[in-house]
Amino acid sequence: MGGMAHAKVCIHVEEDFSRAFVLKHKVKLFKNNDDRNEAYMISKTEFEKTHIAKGEEENRKKAVVFDLDGTLLYTLEDLKNATNYALKQSGMPERTLDEVRRFVGNGVRLLMERAVPQGADNPKFEETFALFKEYYDVHCNDNTSPYDGIMELLEELKVRGIKMAIVSNKIDFAVKSLDKLYFKDYMTAAIGEMEEEGIRKKPAPDMVQKALKELGVTQDEAIYVGDSDVDIATAKNSGLECVSVTWGFRDVEFLKEHGATNLIDEPVELLNYV
């Protein structure tokens, strides 16, 4: 492991030998099941570290604040369909899936400003934006689903007593609707775009601060998880450690260019950070 020659030993995981510790130290799974007493193949040096693992428990996070689109849910098809419905009704050219992928992340108004020719300066913009919202309110779940491994991750976090919340630049109605459909057993709060109430959208810290208040935790006790440059900036502005996911709407190089330092390829890897 790590290029070093360590003697390998096969041990049974103790009750207090957390799975997060196993993942954190890159321990290789020996038997593929979820029994906490399963055997793991680890180095002797790493096994000796298990006595230190108990001390890590004291520094664990108490909460996770999630972005929604591209992080918990694949929503791109429904966003594209709503965009193209509105554009078509207004006699405007439709957009491809890749174009819509590039447009999302800053809220649906900016999505439509990018999709509509001449943006907000187009005389038909407000009408087209209203058509988008009308369509999306009804069709926000036609082709939407959680990413593979998300529901299992949320269940594990719940078992561990980790509190969770969603903050999204998506329309608040849609955020709460999707939360109720998929995550009602897990989320303490689900907060969407609420600028009319004086809560600025991401990357301003307002939404995260509201979530932390509802969770009853401080910024040091929570981590932020998202898939975009907006999420990286949001975490920084809110004083939270950021974990960037690679399965969302932005690729790895883009995330790194925008300051991502903690990258995960699978939902289960988030357990390394709590």
Regions found by a protein language model. Give the residues of each.
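Non-catalytic pre-domain segments flanking phosphatase-related domains
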Residues: 25, 36-66
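Active-site neighborhood of HAD-like aspartate-dependent phosphohydrolases
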Residues: 54-102
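Substrate-recognition element of Asp-dependent hydrolases with the DxDx(T/V) motif
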Residues: 83, 150-179, 187
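Helix-loop "lid/cap" segments that line or gate small-molecule binding pockets
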Residues: 86-87, 107-121, 178, 211-212
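Metal-dependent phosphoesterase signature
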Residues: 113-152
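Substrate-recognition "cap/lid" segment bordering the active-site pocket of phosphatases
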Residues: 142-143, 171-223, 229-238, 252-253
